[in-house]
Amino acid sequence: MELDHTPPPSVLNDNCSASYMTPYATVIAMSGLYLLAIFYFCKKSKKMCQPMSDSIYPYQKRLTQLERELKNYLIDEESIEVDDFQIGQTADGFIFRGGVFPKTRNRFNAKVTTAVKISFPIVSKSISLLEDALRLSKLDHPNLIRLLAVSQLSFTVFRPMIALEWLPGGTLADYFQFKVREKDDSERSPIQLKDMLSILYQVSQALKYIHSQLDEFGQELTHGRIFTRNVLVTEPDLRKCEVKLGDFGDAPMGLEYSTPIIAYMPPEILCCAERIPPHRPENDVWMFGVFIWECLTLGAQPHFRKSVEEIKKSFRLPDRGLSCPPTCPLDVWTLVSDCLSEPHMRPRFASTTNASITSRLSELHHIVSPALFLYAIPNQSVCTCIEHHCQSVIHY
C-alpha cells in the first residue's frame, strides 16, 4: 500500500503566504535598489569624466604634488564664475572673463573680476596649466598678475580651471587698437614718449624679478609671453596708469603658434632645428625689444603679413625687419637695437650694472623731453595676394 505524501491544503497555503511579497515590500525593495544605483553613479561619475587611466598614470605622482602645493588656492567650483566673453587663447587652453566669489555672507555682492583660464581636454595641457599656476603662486611683484584661485575639480575632473587677476583697463593691445588706431586723428589723445617709457620700465621691473628667481633645476625663470596683449593696465590713461605683466607660462613651443606670435621669437628659437628649443633669459630680451617697437609704433604688428621664411630673411637686415619710428630718439632706438642683437651681446634685466635694461629705461625716462609725442605707425606690407585682399600697402 503506497503512502500519500501530498501535504494537506492548510500547509500549502502557509508556505505560499510566507514566500509572497506584499506590494508595500516590493516598493520598499525597489526603492532601496534605486537609491543604491544613484549613490553608486554619483560616487563614480567624476571618475567617469576623467581621461583614460593609462594616460593619467604617468602624471599621477606629479598631480598629487601639485594639489598639495596649491591647497591654499583651492576653492569650490561654484565660487568661480565664467562668462561667455572669451579674452584669448594660449597654448594650454582658453581664457574667459569671469569672477571669484569670496566665502562670505554677502558673497554675491563682493565679486572679484578675474580672467579664468580653462585647459584643453588633453592631459599634457592640463598638467602644463597647473604647473603655470604653481609657478605664478610663488611669485610676488607689483607688476605681475596674481593667482587668485584654483578650482578643486582641477584634480578630480582633470580639466583645470584657474582664476587670475584682471585689471579694469584691459590689455595694452586693446588700448592701442580701440583708443588709438581706430580713432581719427582729432579724437586720439596725445601720448607722450615719457609716459610710454614709464610703462616699459614697469614691465622691465617684472622681468627683472622673474629672471632673478630660480626654478627647481636651479635655472633662471623666463617669461616667454612678452606681448602687448599680455600687459594689463589699471585704467585707460597712460599718464597715470600702472601695468602688470600677465600670462606667465613656459617658453613658446617651436612653430606650433600662429605667425603673429612667431613674429616675436628670436632667431635662435625660430631657426632652431629642435621642435621645442630651450627658452633662455636672452630670448626674453629679444621679445622685449620687439615689445618696445610695438609700443613706440602704438600697436603696429611686427613683421606684418610676413611668412616664416620672410621673417627669417629679415633677421639678416640691420634693423631686423623692424624700422625705426620717425619720432623715436636715438638713445631709445639704441636700446631696441641692443635687445635685437646677438644673444651674447644683449643686455640683461637682472644685471646690477648701469647697463641693465631697467637702469637704461629709468635714465631715459628722466632725460626724455615731455614735448616728445608718439604717433600711430600704420602696418606696412608688400603683400599683393588676393587671399589677404591686399589692394593697399597701408593698414591700421
Swiss-Prot record:
Pseudokinase which plays a role in resistance to fungal infection by promoting expression of antimicrobial peptides (nlp-29, nlp-31, nlp-34, cnc-1, cnc-2 and cnc-4) in the epidermis. In addition, up-regulates nlp-29 expression upon physical wounding and in response to phorbol ester PMA treatment. ATP binds at residues 87-95, 111. GO terms for biological process: defense response to fungus; positive regulation of gene expression; response to wounding. The protein kinase domain is predicted to be catalytically inactive. Keywords: ATP-binding, Glycoprotein, Membrane, Nucleotide-binding, Transmembrane, Transmembrane helix. GO terms for cellular component: plasma membrane. It comes from the Eukaryota. InterPro entries: Kinase-like_dom_sf, Prot_kinase_dom, RTK, Ser-Thr/Tyr_kinase_cat_dom. It is a single-pass membrane protein. This is Protein nipi-4. It comes from Caenorhabditis elegans. It holds the Pfam family PK_Tyr_Ser-Thr. Expressed in the epidermis of larvae and adults and in vulval and rectal cells. One of its GO terms (molecular function) is protein kinase activity.
